[in-house]
């Protein structure tokens, strides 16, 4: 969306080239968009960023950050320290969705965009300092899916 809106978008692949079928399919979708994908050996310059988007890990994260993920989170922290808005996708990387525990080096976002609905971790007081402001994004899940 940002690229289509005229923003200059640069994407870094935190853990290298995709390996799973879903990741490979999304990589192909990315190639069709007006974005720059950094080569693995090209270090990005977080000082130049206006907005940094954390999409390193998702709701399945638990435990500790892998070295590549740790490096990506450190880069995001540098961007935030330089004045960039740090936006997390669904959940800041390094937070465990089930428990609210944060791994050392977990992302501290200014804004978290939660898909469809808040997750239990979003209400956990321990997660508040990592999530920042939380907003919901409608991704088209029918209301009937919310009924138990």
Predicted feature residues:
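YjeF_N-associated NAD(P)HX repair module
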Residues: 49-148
């Amino acid at each position: 969306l940002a690229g289509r809106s005229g923003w200059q978008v640069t994407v870094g692949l935190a853990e290298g080239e995709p390996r799973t079928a879903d990741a490979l399919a999304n990589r192909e979708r990315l190639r069709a968009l007006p974005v720059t994908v950094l080569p693995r050996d090209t270090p990005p310059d977080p000082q130049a960023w206006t907005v940094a988007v954390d999409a390193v890990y998702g709701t399945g994260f638990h435990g500790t950050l892998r070295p590549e993920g740790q490096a990506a989170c450190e880069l995001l922290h540098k961007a935030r320290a330089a004045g960039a808005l740090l936006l997390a996708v669904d959940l800041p990387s390094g937070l465990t969705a089930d428990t609210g525990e944060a791994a050392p080096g977990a992302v501290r976002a200014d804004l978290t965009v939660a898909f469809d609905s808040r997750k239990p971790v979003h209400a956990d007081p321990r997660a508040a300092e990592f999530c920042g402001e939380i907003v919901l994004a409608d991704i088209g899940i029918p209301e009937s899916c919310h009924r138990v």
